[in-house]
Amino acid sequence: MSTNQETRGFQSEVKQLLQLMIHSLYSNKEIFLRELISNASDAADKLRFKALSNPALYEGDGELRVRVSFDETLGTLTISDNGIGMNREQVIDHLGTIAKSGTKEFLNSLGTDQAKDSQLIGQFGVGFYSAFIVADKVTVKTRAAGETQAVLWESAGEGDYTVADIEKATRGTDVILHLREEEKEFLSEWRLREIIGKYSDHIGLPVEIQTTEYNEEGKASGQKWEKINKAQALWTRSKNEISDEEYQEFYKHLSHDYNDSLIWAHNKVEGKQEYTSLLYVPAKAPWDLFNRDQKHGLKLYVQRVFIMDDAEVFMPNYLRFMRGLLDTNDLPLNVSREILQENKITASLRAALTKRALQLLEKLAKDDQAKYQTFWNEFGLVLKEGVGEDFANKQQIASLFRFASTQTDSSEQTVSLADYVGRMKEGQKAIYFLTADSYVAAKNSPHLELFNKKGIEVLLLSDRIDEWVVGHLTEFDGKPLQSITKSDLDLGDLADKEQEESQKAQQAEFGSFLERAQSYFGERVKKVVLTHRLTDTPAVVSTDNDEMTTQMAKLFAAMGQKAPEVKYTFELNPDHRMVKKIADLTDETKFNDWIELLFEQALLAERGSLENPAAFIKRMNKLLG
């Protein structure tokens, strides 16, 4: 009998998620059982951990398990566990709301593309709500370990749910699915065995199914519980015994991802330290990858006992996309997040796991370029953070980077620094790069003209973080990285000696013109000079090596920080007819208008915008009129 009953409305995000999920995931509806068994397994893990300090929570029943049963007459399927259970407040928090920051933004990002939405929802993690894919009503009966009051939760998956106090003799949770008429296929022992074998064989505790016993005459004589999975934690088994399918299903259990992982590494270390690690590289970025409030990390086990989810201290922030677990014998069972932060063992494990993760990415890049490209497209921006965070592994991290390049004529980031170095021209001493707002802007930059003419490859960097990256990554494989937008650009042995001699002569010829232009601009530009880097364009702007670049100034602005004003060097192409024409002008007003127009054009090419575009248009119309 139930008491203290109340009906509550779902959080709006839950209602939206339920509707989207039911329609988007229906083609793979059997995953509901994987999700519910996975939740039951987590509940058992949490009880084991809490019982370390309070064994009375076992209530005399320390044999933890998950049980699956069905009733053909009632049309119900029940998943039961004797894990940690929930009290009334926890039921409302966990089943009536989604306690994930950014949920609203995530749901708003979903559109009408069902295939795409199903992938996104899979990344979000469907969990308990997957029950509504096959059920038109779900009943939950639960009692928290160590408490006497049990709770009933019930909903048809629409606008509201009911919660009430009930009696329940045993701790743990029963999830009862009232199946839709068209979903009665799941009221079959054979079908349930098939699904559990496929998705939950790796669960580290017994999954039992209610089966019929038969006597010697072949007649049904009663019901019994039969264990139908291996019930051995997958990571404790030998690698040789585990199939790829089992590794992938364990990944989905661990991460609640809807997709297979790209690659994994399963390692057991013995000696000074003893631990087992199982690391996975996902194929799709989680929707909250850039949410700083969201914890990302490995599952931590100590001596096979679950301790915590998202133990972020074992992976650096730039590897926060890695999924997996660590099972160690070297930490105490009562370890806390605070203890982990200050622990020498933690630091040693973190260094080892970081190295293992980077080696895994190197293996993926070497063995399967297509899969690595998938990884890079999803997680490249995050990995780039590593050159500023992890000095010890900087070169190894940089070797994993991929860039667009003038060599490939494509915006796809496929070129590694090793590829570039391998193609460097004889006499070339630097790795040349260009940063811009977009690939199109980079590809069409006038700064490339000389390099295109000489056939020198340039890396085209257009991610917002790239300017920060090259600030930390000054060399690779002994070769300095050099921006081609710097005023003191040095081509070394690749320079054209004849052109340099010609330019010296032109310097004398254009001397008074340069002084005149410098006088007009005054403090607005650092200096006005002739340049050898242009072939088709009359002018560009550049910055000195010690000056903040345009892209860095934009990065500051995007973060809401005030950046120092960028002072440019104004470089003019003495072979361009427009420059020659302006140099010959004697009318001061016309000279000022034309030189200003050239400067504005150069600024527009460099920055993509002007502070006063209306004045630019007015000036251009005046000169064209």
From Swiss-Prot:
Residues 1-337 are annotated as: A. Keywords: ATP-binding, Chaperone, Cytoplasm, Nucleotide-binding, Stress response. Residues 555-625 are annotated as: C. The keyword ATP-binding applies. PROSITE patterns: HSP90. It holds the Pfam family HSP90. InterPro entries: HATPase_C_sf, Heat_shock_protein_90_CS, HSP90_C, Hsp90_fam, Hsp90_N, Ribosomal_Su5_D2-typ_SF. GO terms for cellular component: cytoplasm. The keyword Nucleotide-binding applies. Its main location: cytoplasm. It is found in: Cytoplasm. Residues 338-554 are annotated as: B. One of its GO terms (molecular function) is ATP binding. Molecular chaperone. Has ATPase activity. Homodimer. Belongs to the heat shock protein 90 family. HAMAP family: HSP90 (MF_00505). This is Chaperone protein HtpG. It comes from Actinobacillus pleuropneumoniae serotype 5b (strain L20). The gene is htpG.
